[in-house]
Amino acid sequence: ETHLQRAPGERRIYSNAGIEVAGQMLEEATGSPISRWIEESVSEPLGLASLEIEGSPAYSGRANAADLMLFARELAHPTLISTQLASSAQSIHFPELTGIVPGYGNYRPCPWGLGCEIKGDKNPHWTAPQSSVATFGHFGQAGSFLWVDPLSAERAVFVGERPFGQWHHDHWGPLNSQIVQAMRGQ
């Protein structure tokens, strides 16, 4: 049973439970286990040979950097979902909500899309300072990240060796800045 910390629409609180509920709803709608649905609907069409989800769709996914870049390309230029769904996923929902980005602090507002954080005006932030406010992505406790800037189609992934901590907080912004500079030939 899931306990709500706040009423929906009151405050943005990241929760694995929301992703797990979405996974359960997808299983009920399709009659297929979430891992099989992801394999057949995402992994196989995109050629993600290394992607494994053994357990919760909220935190048990594993893939190599090459496959994550293929997935990031899909997020930048969707082929598996409708343009309308892609636009909704990348759009801010409940734009006025205050919330916390784990490891980075409280933000007013704290924009999120459907399952992905949207950079907005957050500062400091784990993506590149020079990426657009529309940049969206996700990072996890495994110390890895994936982001896409839909305005420039720039994207990056990082596969970490150790759990998220102060090192990641201190280095991801500068690392992503260097990545963007390299993509722009600067």
Identify the residue ranges that each predicted region occupies.
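Amphipathic, well-packed alpha-helical segments that form the structural scaffold of globular domains
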Residues: 1-4, 23, 73
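Glycine- and aromatic-rich loop/turn segments at beta-sheet edges
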Residues: 5-8, 49-55
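Helix N-cap/beta->alpha junction signal
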Residues: 15-18, 64
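Active-site-proximal loop and beta-strand segments within enzyme catalytic domains
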Residues: 1-15, 32
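Catalytic loop of the DD-peptidase/beta-lactamase superfamily, centered on the K-T-G motif
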Residues: 10-11, 27-32, 36-44, 54-186
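Short amphipathic alpha-helical face segments that pack within enzyme cores
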Residues: 17-24, 70
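Conserved N-terminal glycine/acidic-rich loop preference
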Residues: 21, 46, 50
